[in-house]
């Protein structure tokens, strides 16, 4: 899309850049000598320096410190779907063990307690880049409170733009049974989106809008940390070729070729994000955006690892959720998990197979989509049988939509790994 601006015709992403940089363009040509850290002593021994303003005092007393804060934006990987709640689950499926929430906990401890920091947790399951951008009905950017301190931002986005759920549904789970479409078609559509420029341009605009929202030219220390995704499978093992994660009897097999292609899709998404980050940083003298690639940290913790019979609901070393599978938080208990879940059958009158699809698609929520597709499948073919194993785990209760939506998302140990990789990246750049 191109827009006429005076005598110039600019692509949409270039127009956004012009708006964000505006009169501050001259700052890009100047050396920025402002420090990027808070120098006060930190309580947590493993924490890196925080991206933040120079200290307003050399005193170690908390009462002399300026209040600090940060924001988390993005999709379900940032929201931490399935990783536990302190109460009723909100519509965004935010989990208490999401890596932004874990960072917020560490951040609060390092600054002297929750009242010394501000954490805006805006990440939402199902979000795309368009839903983060300003002007959308569900805009996370518009929800960001600029009156609160924001010293850095965490961002995770891309999977929903590129059709991760469509690939999972067609190639792995077949929630809509025979009507789920072919795996090849879903993979081709994802590839076409990857090869196009729409996602790149949209991510570019999201980052520039965020810089503009926080008035980056007045906060030279402000930094955006963008996280990627992790490959789902060990693609070298042979035993997984005869295994399936499908929800219906005789679901698709996890053949090596499929695992290789799905892993390649994840790597391509990461590369796209990394290139967009590099493009933005090339406009600035100082780094404004970091890309954190934690994929290798998941080695040994994917599906189809050696000597693992999938689906293995008892393996806590797998960093991704199975359908209805338990979390692997270090202090997790069965009673605690059951207390956090609300049960509902996908075949109850609350799930109308004739009316559920539109709202589910609009929400972008994987769990709502999966539930609706299963209800539609059962209505069309009452003889359908569920796959053997523990698809109906935990006393055969249906936990919706998180029961389904969390599948192939990081469990708590995965989020701890992402958090640690973020810290490692901050340390390596000596922020």
PLM features: what roles do these ranges have?
Residues 231-268, 275-408:
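Mobile gating loops/cap/lid regions near enzyme active sites that modulate substrate access
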């Amino acid at each position: 899309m191109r827009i006429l601006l005076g005598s110039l015709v600019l692509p949409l992403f270039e127009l956004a850049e012009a708006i964000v940089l505006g009169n501050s363009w001259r700052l890009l040509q100047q050396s920025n000598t402002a420090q990027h850290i808070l120098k006060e002593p930190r309580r947590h021994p493993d924490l890196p320096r925080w991206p933040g303003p120079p200290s307003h005092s050399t005193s170690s007393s908390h009462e002399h410190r300026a209040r600090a804060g940060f924001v988390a934006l993005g999709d379900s990987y940032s929201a931490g779907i399935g990783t536990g709640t302190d109460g009723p689950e909100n519509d965004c499926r935010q989990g208490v063990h999401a890596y932004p929430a874990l960072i917020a906990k560490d951040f609060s401890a390092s600054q002297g307690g929750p009242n010394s920091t501000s954490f805006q947790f805006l990440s939402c399951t199902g979000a795309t880049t368009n839903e983060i951008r300003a002007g959308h009905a569900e805009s996370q950017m518009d929800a960001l409170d600029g009156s609160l301190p924001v010293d850095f931002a965490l961002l995770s986005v891309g999977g929903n733009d590129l059709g991760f759920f469509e690939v999972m549904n067609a190639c792995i789970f077949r929630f809509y049974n025979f009507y789920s479409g072919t795996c090849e078609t879903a993979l081709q559509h994802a590839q076409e989106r990857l090869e196009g420029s729409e996602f790149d341009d949209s991510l570019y605009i999201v980052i520039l809008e965020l810089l503009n929202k926080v008035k980056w030219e007045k906060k030279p220390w402000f930094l955006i940390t963008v996280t990627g995704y992790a490959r789902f499978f060990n693609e070298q093992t042979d035993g997984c070729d005869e295994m399936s994660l499908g929800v219906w009897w005789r679901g698709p097999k996890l053949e090596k070729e499929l695992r290789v292609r799905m892993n390649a899709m994840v790597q391509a998404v990461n590369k796209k994000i990394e290139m967009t980050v590099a493009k933005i940083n090339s406009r600035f003298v100082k780094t404004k955006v970091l890309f954190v690639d934690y994929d290798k940290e998941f080695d040994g913790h994917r599906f189809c690892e050696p000597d693992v019979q999938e689906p293995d609901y008892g393996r806590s070393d797998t960093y991704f959720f199975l359908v209805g599978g338990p979390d692997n938080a270090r202090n997790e208990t069965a009673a605690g998990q059951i207390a956090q879940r609300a049960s509902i059958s996908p075949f109850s009158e609350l799930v109308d197979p004739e009316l559920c699809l539109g709202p589910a698609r609009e929400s972008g929520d994987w769990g709502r989509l999966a539930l609706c597709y299963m209800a539609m499948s059962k209505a069309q073919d009452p003889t359908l049988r569920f796959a053997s194993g523990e698809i109906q785990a935990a006393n055969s209760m249906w936990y919706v939509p998180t029961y389904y939506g969390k599948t192939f998302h990081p469990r708590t140990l995965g989020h701890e790994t992402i958090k640690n990789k973020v810290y490692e990246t901050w340390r390596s750049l000596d922020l």
